[in-house]
A protein has these predicted regions:
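Extended, low-hydrophobicity, polar/charged segments
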Residues: 1-156
């Protein structure tokens, strides 16, 4: 898988845990005995014909009006599952790691995810999670940071 090759070639510090297969980021948080705010979920959108990876915490949702402002266009919609499978051929559907740059995707991370010292994400499969420090993730993934998510705990 691209993610392990990239992390190993970058001499990244990370750990991998295995768990029963889960099909949601909140499910992974429960399996990993972690708060959902530490679990990064990538959401793939299509904007002006180009795919963009939006990374946010498991309990949060994309606020499309905010995202439209960030992207500078009203042409923003969720990518179709078939498109996502084509972009991430080495990943199980719905288990994409939050490293858009490995797939030539612009990556934008919600600023609320940045507040914590570590991050957990799916490793391309539904039964493995990668744990790493937030500083390492930011250094390797190089996401743009923006406010584009709805945060239920804050009401916005």
């Amino acid at each position: 898988m691209k993610i392990f090759d990239y992390l190993d070639q970058s001499n990244a510090t990370y750990s991998v845990s295995e768990h029963k297969p889960v099909y949601s980021s909140q499910g992974m948080a429960a399996e990993e005995h972690e708060k959902g705010r530490y679990v990064a979920k990538p959401v793939i959108v299509k904007s002006q014909g180009t795919h963009v990876m939006c990374v946010l915490a498991a309990p949060h949702k994309v606020a499309f009006e905010k995202l439209k402002d960030v992207l500078g266009t009203d042409d923003v919609k969720l990518a179709e599952e078939q498109e996502i499978r084509q972009v991430f051929p080495d990943c199980e559907e719905g288990a994409e790691p939050p490293f858009g740059r490995l797939y030539d995707l612009r990556t934008i991370m919600d600023k609320a995810l940045e507040r914590d010292d570590h991050i957990i994400f799916q490793a391309g499969t539904h039964d493995k999670a990668i744990h790493m420090g937030m500083k390492d993730y930011l250094s390797l993934a190089k996401p743009e940071i923006a406010d584009f998510a709805y945060h239920p705990e804050r009401g916005a």
